[in-house]
A protein has these predicted regions:
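C-terminal substrate-recognition "lid" of short-chain dehydrogenase/reductases
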Residues: 2, 126, 220-248, 253
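Conserved glycine-rich cofactor-binding loop
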Residues: 14-15
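Conserved glycine-rich Rossmann-like NAD(P)H-binding loop of the short-chain dehydrogenase/reductase
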Residues: 30-46
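The beta1-alpha1 cofactor-binding region of Rossmann-like NAD(H)/NADP(H)-dependent oxidoreductases
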Residues: 41-42, 62-74, 108, 225
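Catalytic loop of short-chain dehydrogenase/reductase
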Residues: 94-95, 108, 139-166, 171-179, ...
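Substrate-binding pocket helix/loop in short-chain dehydrogenase/reductase
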Residues: 99-103, 107-112, 208, 212
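A glycine/serine/threonine-rich, flexible loop-to-helix segment
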Residues: 154-156, 191-216
Length: 255
């Protein structure tokens, strides 16, 4: 896919992997990029301004992907302001940190939120954007996780791993449902150095990184720009690729 003239939407795009994707797309030549956020208004607006100053039209839109009405309103605003949508990156996600062995702590409320955001949220965005994407032979990239591929030891919770596995399967289903006009692919990143991860581990974060890195053949964890690069590669270099999941894990799944 050539990016000149294209418009992209990145959910959960204010920072971390999402923010890196926004910057990659802007540098690669899209004409417009929309940054979706739920709570990170300051970060999203600052990033939109950064992208505008780089010469690419940008806006930040608040929308909770758990709310179908808000998702539809977001897509309608994109249609009104940009006239098109070519690329959807379903990056928004949520987890709760619950030991895999602690089944009692994994409540129905936790299950419901994790599945609603990580799976149904991606579906809502794809459904709302489908007609715009079909109009210009567009592309969807879903952001899953290595937790949806490997053993429970990689999971923040059993519900999160299950949801990310479901997102991989949703990718296959959407690839069939939206063919031949829209390609749908997925990335499954391993441990990535993001504010989300550092915020969870706090003072122990550097120690956690060191311990985790020892288990990777590349002897380190990922940075957001590396995941964004893989996503960009699927968008620009995979015109005959659909329904696939690219594992971006520094070789972790080999060990």
């Amino acid at each position: 896919m050539e990016l000149n003239g294209r418009v992209a939407l990145v959910t959960g795009g204010a920072g971390g992997i999402g923010g890196a994707v926004v910057r990659r797309l802007a540098k690669a030549g899209v004409s417009g990029v929309v940054i979706n956020y739920r709570r990170s208004a300051k970060e999203a607006e600052a990033l939109a301004l950064e992208i505008e100053r780089a010469g690419v039209k940008s806006m930040a839109i608040q929308a909770d992907i758990q709310n179908d009405g808000q998702v539809k309103s977001m897509i309608a605003k994109i249609r009104a302001d940009f006239g098109r949508l070519d690329i959807l990156v379903n990056n928004a996600g949520v987890t709760h940190w619950v030991k895999v062995s602690d089944l009692e702590a994994l409540t129905d409320a936790i299950w419901d939120e994790i599945l609603d955001v990580n799976v149904k949220g991606a579906f809502r965005c794809a459904r709302a954007a489908a007609k715009l994407l079909e109009a210009n032979s567009g592309m969807i990239v879903n952001v899953s996780s290595i937790s949806g591929v490997l053993s429970p030891s990689t999971m923040s919770s059993l519900a999160y791993g299950t949801a990310k596995a479901a997102l991989i399967h949703l990718t296959k289903g959407l690839a069939v449902a939206l063919a031949p006009r829209v390609r749908v692919n997925c990335v499954a990143p391993a441990f990535t150095d993001t504010p989300w991860m550092s915020g969870h581990y706090g003072e122990k974060y550097e120690q956690v990184i060191e311990q985790a890195s020892a288990g990777y053949p590349l002897q380190r964890i990922a940075i957001p720009d590396e995941i964004a690069g893989a996503i960009l590669g699927l968008i620009t270099g995979g015109d005959f690729v659909t329904g696939q999941t690219l594992i971006v894990d520094g070789g972790l799944s080999l060990s």
